[in-house]
């Protein structure tokens, strides 16, 4: 991929052979962002485990990720009032199921009560493809719809590694204070280490980097980050 002059000039600010502590990495990564909009600060970390399909869960970022999350809730009766009061943008039962079945997916997260899952499950080809299918392990199949909506709105994100074993997550915006970004990142590390499979051997997090949406990736001293976060 061809890189522009702006990127090449910014890349010279970062020593690609060096591993930085997390405070330095966040400061450097933010300084290389060259978007006209408020870009996202992202982390990438490679997990050391053979059964990648077992690595997944949710992380509640203390300062959110700066993203407005439009939540849809499939539920009935009084639960609909609870979901609306919590701030869900779209609330309904069979009416919403029919709308989504028609191809509408103009929302970012989806919650369902257990009694709705028989019908919601039929939307698998649509919701599954976009990563929107409610799941008990992710806390999005629940009777406490208000709690689920609040957590999604306040920055709870779902994680899973890609085929190469790398977990990618947005942890805030370039406009965030450095301290808030660092705290969000430390929360990611704490959660990943807490969720580490019991039979994982050696260093669980092999590499770690921080980068803006458009900018330069900065390598982090992963051992120091883990040791100072847990």
From Swiss-Prot:
GO cellular component terms listed in the entry, alphabetical order: large ribosomal subunit
InterPro entries: Ribosom_uL1_bac-type (IPR005878), Ribosomal_uL1 (IPR002143), Ribosomal_uL1-like (IPR023674), Ribosomal_uL1/biogenesis (IPR028364), Ribosomal_uL1_3-a/b-sand (IPR016095), Ribosomal_uL1_CS (IPR023673)
Swiss-Prot/TrEMBL GO biological process terms: regulation of translation; translation
Assigned keywords, A-Z: Repressor, Ribonucleoprotein, Ribosomal protein, RNA-binding, rRNA-binding, Translation regulation, tRNA-binding
GO molecular function: rRNA binding; structural constituent of ribosome; tRNA binding
Function statement: Binds directly to 23S rRNA. The L1 stalk is quite mobile in the ribosome, and is involved in E site tRNA release.
Self-association and partners: Part of the 50S ribosomal subunit.
Entries under PANTHER family matching the protein: 54S RIBOSOMAL PROTEIN L1, MITOCHONDRIAL, LARGE RIBOSOMAL SUBUNIT PROTEIN UL1M
Family designation: Belongs to the universal ribosomal protein uL1 family.
Entry protein name: Large ribosomal subunit protein uL1
Organism field: Leptospira borgpetersenii serovar Hardjo-bovis (strain L550)
Gene that produces this protein: rplA
